[in-house]
Amino acid sequence: MPIDKAKIEKAVRMILEAIGEDPEREGLRETPRRVADMFEELLEGYDFTEEYTWFTEATDLVVVSGIRFYSLCEHHLLPFFGVAHVAYLPRGKVIGLSKIVRIVNKYSRRLQIQERMTKQIADEISKATGSPDVMVITEAVHLCMAMRGVRNGAPTVVAAVRGEFERDQSLKEEVYRIIEPHRLSRVIALSFF
């Protein structure tokens, strides 16, 4: 989806004027262009195309944990950010680990809500691996909630649990044990930014 940067720049100028600012003053003169460039970068997930290469024949649990992501809330255009944890049981094929990170980026770098993003990641992991046994957990802080409204930055946790992970409680618990060191509260403590 190509972004119309000229329209974004015009809209940002109008917003600046609407709040009583002078878009030509020092410090704001380049803001419309910077905002357009920012949206182009933050929304690059719409242009994601990926071919998947399968590697080894495997059946053991695969977990990629603590994948950092940034997204934009579609309701307020404010960031939400956090970590994603992806687990799946291969059905004879394993995709490259970097592909899992790219899938998270594909769906986080869009106007989003966390619930839909988590489901989309799980769907794509299932499609890419050919496995119905997928578990995706996302943990995020939403600035639309932290900076406005209730003004509370409590993390939101969303899980998409499919296949064996739904049926086998011990398997689900194993994933939670594996991801524990990479949970959002620990990542933030280690400096997310």
Curated annotation (Swiss-Prot):
<feature type="binding site">
    <location>
        <position position="76"/>
    </location>
    <ligand>
        <name>Zn(2+)</name>
    </ligand>
</feature>
<dbReference type="GO" id="GO:0006729">
    <property type="term" value="P:tetrahydrobiopterin biosynthetic process"/>
</dbReference>
<dbReference type="GO" id="GO:0008270">
    <property type="term" value="F:zinc ion binding"/>
</dbReference>
<dbReference type="InterPro" id="IPR018234">
    <property type="entry name" value="GTP_CycHdrlase_I_CS"/>
</dbReference>
<keyword id="KW-0479">Metal-binding</keyword>
<comment type="subunit">
    <text>Homomer.</text>
</comment>
<keyword id="KW-0547">Nucleotide-binding</keyword>
<feature type="binding site">
    <location>
        <position position="144"/>
    </location>
    <ligand>
        <name>Zn(2+)</name>
    </ligand>
</feature>
<comment type="pathway">
    <text>Cofactor biosynthesis; 7,8-dihydroneopterin triphosphate biosynthesis; 7,8-dihydroneopterin triphosphate from GTP: step 1/1.</text>
</comment>
<keyword id="KW-0554">One-carbon metabolism</keyword>
<dbReference type="GO" id="GO:0003934">
    <property type="term" value="F:GTP cyclohydrolase I activity"/>
</dbReference>
<dbReference type="GO" id="GO:0046654">
    <property type="term" value="P:tetrahydrofolate biosynthetic process"/>
</dbReference>
<protein>
    <recommendedName>
        <fullName>GTP cyclohydrolase 1</fullName>
        <ecNumber>3.5.4.16</ecNumber>
    </recommendedName>
</protein>
<dbReference type="InterPro" id="IPR043134">
    <property type="entry name" value="GTP-CH-I_N"/>
</dbReference>
<dbReference type="GO" id="GO:0005525">
    <property type="term" value="F:GTP binding"/>
</dbReference>
<keyword id="KW-0378">Hydrolase</keyword>
<dbReference type="Pfam" id="PF01227">
    <property type="entry name" value="GTP_cyclohydroI"/>
</dbReference>
<comment type="similarity">
    <text>Belongs to the GTP cyclohydrolase I family.</text>
</comment>
<dbReference type="InterPro" id="IPR043133">
    <property type="entry name" value="GTP-CH-I_C/QueF"/>
</dbReference>
<keyword id="KW-0862">Zinc</keyword>
<feature type="binding site">
    <location>
        <position position="73"/>
    </location>
    <ligand>
        <name>Zn(2+)</name>
    </ligand>
</feature>
<keyword id="KW-0342">GTP-binding</keyword>
<dbReference type="GO" id="GO:0005737">
    <property type="term" value="C:cytoplasm"/>
</dbReference>
<dbReference type="InterPro" id="IPR001474">
    <property type="entry name" value="GTP_CycHdrlase_I"/>
</dbReference>
<dbReference type="GO" id="GO:0006730">
    <property type="term" value="P:one-carbon metabolic process"/>
</dbReference>
<dbReference type="InterPro" id="IPR020602">
    <property type="entry name" value="GTP_CycHdrlase_I_dom"/>
</dbReference>
